[in-house]
A protein has these predicted regions:
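Feature marks short, highly hydrophobic, charge-poor N-terminal signal-anchor/signal peptide-like helices
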Residues: 1-7
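C-terminal single-pass membrane-anchor helix
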Residues: 7-15
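N-terminal topogenic membrane-targeting module
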Residues: 19-90
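Generic structural signal of hydrophobic/aromatic residues within well-ordered alpha-helices
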Residues: 25, 29, 64, 82, ...
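Short acidic, glycine/proline-enriched loop segments that cap or flank alpha-helices
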Residues: 36, 55-56, 135-142, 161-164
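Charge-rich, acidic-biased intrinsically disordered regions
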Residues: 66-69, 90-104, 169-181
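Interfacial alpha-helical end/capping and short helix-turn segments at domain and membrane boundaries
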Residues: 72-158
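Glycine-rich, aromatic-bearing surface loops/beta-hairpins
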Residues: 140-201
Length: 201
């Protein structure tokens, strides 16, 4: 009986510690995101891409693409500023566990199994910028698909930091009906390489 009581209270303790740590992470990232309109701009972009891609008449889609350019530029600037601003945070607070589920204090107890969110945000900012420059000379339709994937992967990373990799992947599927592997395959080769080098190291 004593064993079951100990196990019960231990489970409660772990859950409470995990919840407290996740709240701290949400508050930390939220305090930086609130300076920008990233979420609003990202929704506008993805909705705009869908509208433009749904038009079969180039004359009707052209104004939509044109209107999206200023939003794309804003997202590029905000991602770069977010990555720069977060570098002022003490390193231990930005560590992210590679484990699929959240474990309290994993960033302190198992630092070798973590990566730095600050570095990851640099990868996302660079990836969006590179895709927007369109060095690969993709047609606008294909570029929009790639930019959408870059944004979805950025969202996944934010949820991974705040919750866990498993929760982030579930939210990606629930919100966009798109799997993590699909998104990873759709970003630029440079983003995919730099991303995997960091999160799988």
């Amino acid at each position: 009986m004593d064993f079951f009581f100990l196990a019960f209270f231990a489970t409660i303790g772990v859950y409470a510690a995990k919840t407290a740590e996740q709240r701290q992470r949400i508050a930390l990232l939220g305090s930086y995101l609130q300076k920008f309109q990233l979420e609003k701009h990202m929704e506008q972009l993805i909705d705009g891409y869908l509208r433009a891609l749904g038009e079969n008449d180039p004359q009707r889609s052209a104004p939509i693409w044109s209107n999206l350019e200023s939003i794309e530029a804003a997202v590029r600037e905000e991602l770069a500023r977010l990555a720069d601003d977060l570098h002022e945070v003490w390193g231990e607070r930005t560590r992210v566990s590679r484990w699929p589920v959240a474990v309290p204090f994993a960033n302190r107890l198992f630092p070798a199994s973590t990566f730095d969110l600050r570095t990851l945000l640099k990868v996302h900012a660079k990836g969006f910028d590179t895709s927007l420059r369109n060095d690969d000379q993709l047609v606008r339709r294909d570029q929009a698909f790639r930019l959408t994937a870059e944004l979805m992967l950025f969202q996944h990373s934010c949820h991974w930091f705040c919750r866990s990799r498993t929760v982030a992947s579930a939210r990606l599927m629930a919100r966009h009906k798109t799997g993590y592997d699909q998104v990873l395959a759709a970003v630029s080769p440079e983003t995919r390489r730099d991303y995997l080098d960091l999160v799988q190291a």
